[in-house]
Structures are given as structure tokens and as C-alpha cells.
Design a protein with these regions (language model features):
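Active-site nucleophile loop of the alpha/beta-hydrolase fold
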Residues: 12, 40-44, 96-106
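Gly/Ala-rich beta-loop-alpha elbow adjacent to hydrolase catalytic centers
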Residues: 68-79
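Short beta-strand/loop motif that positions the catalytic acidic residue
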Residues: 123-125, 129-132, 136
């Protein structure tokens, strides 16, 4: 990551405040004099797909990130945006990290406006990496493998990491910091 690169960190349902790894990543980038945006998306505990898509479009237009790091529902949000005809007007980003994407057929009432979600044809990123856990309650490894195959992207499967969030012990997470900050 060069000093000029801008990193946008997008949380999932409920946010990703400290001690979540996304909050730690934002702090690590800032401590290294990097440029980071870690916005709180509208009504994160009761999200609306349409409101989040609109907000993300505004963020992309204003911030113009080089790298985007999505956790959970933020990955689904990215899929929805990539399926929009107006996405072609937004410049392709350099890197996209998708951590713990939920199944595209997730059935949870509070986030039902996001599902089912069709996988986009294009992720609008030059490099994409997906990281999941083998015991994530929101996606099976088989579906993650299918997604990775469709997009022809690398998939990292971590053992017993749950939903890769603070509840499963992922506060400071060196792997994602190293990948995003290009130390690996």
C-alpha cells in the first residue's frame, strides 16, 4: 500500500466498532499515516439495502478509494452495487477484500432486504481476495468455494474462526493488516 492509497473499510450488520478487527485495521492504517475511511453506515442494526447502496455510492464518489475491505453484509452490499447499471461509471478499484461474506440466500428477518442476492458478473476490482472460516454460521465453505471459482479469486479458509469478528476472537488481526498494508 503506498502512502497515497486510500482504504475504505465497510462494516456489516451491527457495525464493527472496537474491539472488532476492522476498527483495529483502521487504527493501524492511520498510525502508519495512511488514508482510511471507516464510516458508520446508516442504521447499522436495522439496515436497509437501498439506503446502504445510496450511502455507499456517495462515499465512493467523495472518497475515491483504492482498496475496499468488506466484512460480512458489506460484501453483499458490494455485490448489489456491482449489479447496478451505474456501477460502470465508478472507476475500478485496485484491491477488494471480502471477509466472511454471508450466503447469498441468507434468511434473517432484520437484513432480509439484502437477500436473496445475485452474484455480479464483475467485482470492479483489479485484485480480489476472499477470506472465510470453516465454521462460519452464515456461509458454508462449499458456497464460498463456488463464489471464489466464479470470480477466479483466491480463497483463504481459516479453521474455527466463526464469523471472523470480535465475538470469535478477531480483534487485532495481523493477517488482514499485513495483506491490506502489503506487508505480505
Amino acid at each position: 500500500m503506498s502512502m497515497q492509497d486510500k482504504v475504505l473499510i465497510l462494516h456489516g450488520w451491527g457495525g464493527s466498532d472496537a474491539p472488532h478487527w476492522q476498527a483495529e485495521l483502521a487504527a493501524a492504517i492511520a498510525k502508519d499515516y495512511g488514508t482510511v475511511s471507516f464510516p458508520l453506515l446508516d442504521n447499522c442494526h436495522f439496515p436497509s439495502k437501498n439506503r446502504w447502496v445510496k450511502q455507499l455510492k456517495e462515499i465512493l464518489e467523495d472518497f475515491k478509494p483504492d482498496t475496499i475491505v468488506c466484512h460480512s453484509l458489506a460484501t453483499t452490499l458490494w455485490f448489489w452495487l456491482c449489479n447496478e447499471p451505474t456501477m460502470k461509471e465508478i472507476p475500478q478499484i485496485k484491491r477488494l477484500f471480502m471477509v466472511s461474506p454471508p450466503s447469498i440466500t441468507t434468511e434473517v428477518d432484520t437484513i432480509k432486504t439484502f437477500f436473496p442476492c445475485e452474484l455480479p458478473e464483475n467485482l470492479y476490482a483489479k485484485e480480489v481476495q476472499m477470506i472465510v472460516s470453516d465454521n462460519d454460521p452464515y456461509i458454508q465453505v462449499k458456497e464460498a468455494e463456488s463464489m471464489a471459482k466464479k470470480f477466479d479469486i483466491p480463497l483463504t479458509v481459516i479453521k474455527n474462526a466463526g464469523h471472523i469478528n470480535a465475538d470469535s476472537g478477531y480483534g487485532k488481526w495481523e493477517l488482514i493488516e499485513d495483506l491490506v498494508m502489503e506487508k505480505r
